Amino acid sequence: MPYAVLAAALVALDQLVKYLVSHNIPLGGHVPLLPHLVELTYFQNTVAAFSMLEEHTWLLTLISAVMSVVLGVAVWKKFFAHPFGRCALTLVLAGAVGNLIDRALQGYVVDMFNVLFMDFAIFNVADICVVVGGIAACVYYVFFYEKLEGKGTLHEHADADR
């Protein structure tokens, strides 16, 4: 239950920020957020990361929907037993759902955070959730999964089968 609340809160935050930006900043407009560091730039993104799948919004929507279901089941079925692992998956789920809502309803994703001190893509709250959750899930799996969940490694299982 707390993971559903966390996911819902993050999706709500993502949608609120997107609403505020799209209703208060003209398309392509800029508003300083942290002067000389980050500005809000209203951008309508029709592609995936690194301009992949341009002109295939339906495919991005389908992929987002499938991933949302898979991640939801993984959290619900406790793919990671430890709360840290489930929180990581919940972050990725919230990000997937946040961007899925935009793609399904508008055909594009509203992006707004523009980092000024380096050449980087404009992104949104959902993207932050996906990246932070994905990194956390990888760190958890690589460094803590076996220790915290008490499961043997793939190599141990393979050796036992011989």
Annotate each predicted stretch with a short phrase.
Residues M1-R162:
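Alpha-helical transmembrane bundles and membrane-interface segments of multipass inner-membrane proteins
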